[in-house]
């Protein structure tokens, strides 16, 4: 398995849809997604949002975001599909084609959204992984819902992935999926990427279900993080908590991996690669945006306000975003 250097919103209870065909101008046709994807992305949210127009009609619109932008060309080239929640509880849209990829909605009930997503994912894992001032909340019912929903994602992925296909599971909401999917489809190659920090042993040990999470991630062939120290944290956990042999390699060097030896039988092991893959920047897109007339006009206004400096730089500081409010 290889992984490139690439790496939602609140549901509206009034939105309702019963099929994959929207009623807006951008209506879509449903398809059979069984064993369709040579390259399958599994994420909590879809790359498209179900929106309600002013006239009451509903349609699917492409979601903004770096992951969608980065993966779309790969999905088109490799007959890809994307499994995710459509962002609206208690609906069951059918799979459909959009922009050269197969979109496979996975329905979640209102209770599952509350317990699996708002509860365990965002009130347990998010503050724990970020070491927030606000302490995580640990609830057994949230954990059971997390297990149940992860199982459903894994089962749907097993149905959609083509024989010997590649499945890329994304982020903290779905950390049990790799192991579950491996049990269902040992033929596929599985990658997992975490889009948030991975905590050190001292923090992770607070989690009552820490061993289950570690085993879930080790179901993958390749586990990726943004930064080298996140990868090192994970490897250390596998050694201390699960007693697996590890080889750190040169995780700090691009293109190099550490490895974890996962026992699969008497004197047999499966190697799980661990590495850091920081997301890249779409430079051509930003360059094109900077050349737009509206942007250049606003730039001139700012220059005048700042005393006409020779050079002007724009910075966006993520630390201004409240860390306890995941999207």
Model regions and ranges:
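N-terminal low-complexity, Ser/Thr- and acidic-residue-enriched intrinsically disordered segments
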Residues: 4-111, 203-207, 229, 237
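Active-site proximal beta-strand in glycosyltransferases
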Residues: 40-43, 167, 183-199, 217-225
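Nucleotide-sugar donor phosphate/pyrophosphate-binding loop at the beta->alpha transition
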Residues: 57-63, 149-151, 196-215, 248, ...
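Conserved nucleotide-sugar donor-binding subdomain of glycosyltransferases
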Residues: 112-166, 295, 301-310
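Short His-centered aromatic/hydrophobic patch
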Residues: 171-174
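A short, active-site helix/loop in glycosyltransferases that binds the activated sugar's phosphate group
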Residues: 221-296
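Short hydrophobic "strand-cap" motifs at the C-terminus of beta-strands
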Residues: 226, 315-318
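Residue-level detector of conserved catalytic or cofactor/ligand-binding positions
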Residues: 319-327
